[in-house]
């Protein structure tokens, strides 16, 4: 499989971390990047206080993610990034300058994702911020570089479907 920049996107609690990390494990030279770990402290503090991020908070974070993905590609790895990438402008910004990229959108209902979030512990993202994420979400338009998956499936089914799709695109 040729090296592409792969982003697993969706609202908080949809399973990005689970799917992206396992997908990276199953890809030859795959490397997992947890987008949340690249947030600057001020973004984490804002979210921890229950304040949704706005676009002015995100651009420097995206620049850090892009730089990390480019480094991994230069090392011969396939970066698999877990990142909300809620708006089309965010996705356009992330993929600008990458000749090969793939987007995997994990899709689920508010009620299902809220129930999952209420059952887990997260450093700063709470189910209270989920409504703002759904409000900000711009569902990606159909595209050859896009795979949309329903999170009603098991994580293993999601990962295997994504892996097979990526192989079919190489």
PLM regions and their residue ranges:
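Hydrophobic anchor at the beta1->P-loop junction of P-loop NTPases
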Residues: 8
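Walker A (P-loop) ATP-phosphate-binding motif of ABC ATPase nucleotide-binding domains
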Residues: 5
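Conserved substrate/cofactor phosphate-moiety recognition/catalytic segment
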Residues: 21-64
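Small-molecule kinase domains that catalyze NTP-dependent phosphoryl transfer to phosphate-bearing small molecules
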Residues: 119-161
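Conserved beta-strand scaffold positions in the cores of enzyme catalytic domains, especially
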Residues: 32, 103-105, 146-148
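Conserved lysine of the Walker
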Residues: 16
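Glycine-rich phosphate-binding loop used to anchor ATP phosphates in small-molecule kinases
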Residues: 57-98, 102, 106
